[in-house]
Amino acid sequence: MTILVVTGTGTGVGKTVVCAALASAARQAGIDVAVCKPVQTGTARGDDDLAEVGRLAGVTQLAGLARYPQPMAPAAAAEHAGMALPARDQIVRLIADLDRPGRLTLVEGAGGLLVELAEPGVTLRDVAVDVAAAALVVVTADLGTLNHTKLTLEALAAQQVSCAGLVIGSWPDPPGLVAASNRSALARIATVRAALPAGAASLDAGDFAAMSAAAFDRNWVAGLVG
């Protein structure tokens, strides 16, 4: 059994498509997969990351908890809606209920690592500690990514949360000078597990499956579940 939290250096870096791609690659390797997104914002405009994962990767074990209409940080979205954030133990229980032998459970955060997900002030980093999970960090190839990535990795290390590697959530074709340079530099910071092509979320299920299988190292994926 393995629990892996999927965080990012910020909002809009591609966490959902990375969750879907890793889930797809794992399923193609014969691994049972569940995906959990405890907190979702922006539902009023149709945001539904779990449904997107299901559409792209064919995962049926999908679990969510709190949903807020406005596309804001969870605490702000909850306040705007006159609602509360979930409690820490609710999130931990949601994840624990999914975990079982032979299964890879992916837990997607909201925004970056230190965004408040539960009251009082509980972040995805705290949840990772609670469920003994490593963190896969989704990054960009854009200017500024090196600083954002290092800050995220330092925050993980401060609470002894292992980094399972980096994934570039949107790799341009062709890559420019900055993107190419940053990819090389990111690989010196931590292992880059994959670089997903820009626009991957628009692929149909068959093409997405092929892309996902090619993106990740098969041995690494197979080794995620012991």
From Swiss-Prot:
Cofactor names: Mg(2+)
Gene Ontology terms for molecular function: ATP binding; dethiobiotin synthase activity; magnesium ion binding
Pfam families: AAA_26
Active-site residue list: 37
GO cellular component: a single term: cytosol
Key words, A-Z: ATP-binding, Biotin biosynthesis, Cytoplasm, Ligase, Magnesium, Metal-binding, Nucleotide-binding
Family: Belongs to the dethiobiotin synthetase family.
UniProt protein name: ATP-dependent dethiobiotin synthetase BioD
